[in-house]
Amino acid sequence: MGSAITGWGSALPDKVLTNADFEAHLDTTDQWIVERTGIRERHIGGSTRGLAIEAGHAALARAGLAGADIELVVVATTTPDQTLPAASATVHEALGCRGGAFDLNAACAGFTYSLVLADSMITAGVRRALVIGSDTLSRSTDFEDRATAILFGDGAGAVVLEAGARDDLVLAYDLGADGTAAPLLYAEIGGFIEMDGREIFRRAVRAEVDSIGKVFAAAGCTADDIALFVPHQANVRIIEAVNERIGLPMERTVVVIDRIGNTSAGSIPYGLADAANAGRLDEGDLVLLSGFGAGMTWASVVIRWGRRGVA
């Protein structure tokens, strides 16, 4: 028996920063930002915990479950509200879950790491898991720095995994890291995000294309078999470059960066929930998730969408 995604949800803060807001105090324009990033607006505010709880509630409701039905909570985040306790513990309590809870920090690739790990724990005996990606990068953003201020937003996404599916959820995955790239994107404790955007772009495209090639080979599929691609929403030009290299049309790709910016671990589950709510996913579809982040870390996974026998 495998697992299946039976619920999904997302959350964004109410406050919206548009590109026009940056035009007022930075040497930039809406056209410049859109051409280089694809971003038109981003949401900021709230807490990592609060957004995670909201997204988790939505995912549970979609799955028709209560918090007490959940035996494992995994929260992917690089921006916990406090050093101790883990965000997952407070989310676990707020939602009334049972079993274990832990945080996972793999930066923007964190949700994909967490999904793979939760699926393996279901194989080992967990019946139901709640996997959340939640980040509030605005708290680490210098809004006087044009290079980073325009990029980041706050947000969360969540999925419920349940055991009992006839087929495996995860067909193949690839996880990777390269610590030599750590100086290219980092934030000291209490400091702002520092990044070398040009080099990050180059390495991200290369790492993601290589990772996707590995999961295609392991899953025995090609880009033609993928019904939908949900990439990390860092920069639309990165998404376009990856798609061109793997031979996947943008029409089969989720792009939400224009309205949420880069929400780190929240971006892939947010995009997945957005696609599911829009009716872009059908039973049995092969879905590609892929992302990269500080570390550098990267992760790709091919999953099969649908309940397929889950009661």
Regions found by a protein language model. Name each.
Residues 2-5, 72-74, 101, 127-131, ...:
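Short glycine-aspartate micro-motif
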Residues 1-46, 145-206, 210-213, 292, ...:
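Condensing-enzyme catalytic core mediating Claisen C-C bond formation in acyl metabolism
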Residues 55-71, 210-227, 275-280:
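Phosphate/pyrophosphate-binding loops at sites that engage ATP/ADP/AMP, CoA/4′-phosphopantetheine
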Residues 62, 66-98:
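Anion-binding (especially nucleotide phosphate/pyrophosphate-binding) glycine-rich loop
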Residues 119, 123, 127-155:
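Flexible, glycine-rich active-site loops centered on histidine and acidic residues
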Residues 5-7, 33, 59, 73, ...:
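Buried hydrophobic positions in well-ordered alpha/beta secondary-structure cores of metabolic enzymes
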Residues 21-24, 28, 47-50, 79-89, ...:
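A structural motif shared across PLP-dependent enzymes of the aminotransferase-like
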